[in-house]
Amino acid sequence: MQSIRWIFGLGLVMSAACQPALAEALNREQLLEQMKAMRPVDLVVLDQSDGADEYTLGIFAVSGDPADPELRRFKLWQEYADNLVIPTESVNCSREEPLRVTRDTEAIYVRKLNPGGSQRASTREDHLVWWAACHPELAGQDPAGLADKARELGYSTELIESQEVLRLPAP
């Protein structure tokens, strides 16, 4: 009889211990569904990864600059398993100096790109975003396979990529 009570008690303890984890999993799933429901209608998904590091990268609200037809402003949709970040960024689509300008709390980053040229894994997102903003019909395509298209559009594919970091003043 004591063993039955012990097993029953152990079952109660286990269910009480698992309940927060189950609630957390449900809350996480609800959060993910809410984020998906909030996605803008003009969102174009550029990249996704599943699993523990679930991530969705998208672009929306792309607009040209009336003063400079080579500039585009847009919002990124960076959806993580437990967070949503929506920064506003810009790109320059010129054939001579294509670039992406992004920022965080510490700095502004000016990244000179080489559309259609060789690229590193660390610049893949830059190229995905640049192609989507400058040539929306190619949004979401793997930038590594766009060399012929880049040359067709007048890009040299032989530019030197670099990054300039402009530190922001400390608060």
Per-region residue spans from a language model:
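Detector for methionine-enriched segments
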Residues: M1, M14, M35-M38
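Bacterial N-terminal signal peptides
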Residues: G9-A17
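Bacterial N-terminal signal peptides that target proteins for export
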Residues: M1-F8
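N-terminal secretory-pathway/extracellular module detecting exported/lumenal segments
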Residues: A23-P171
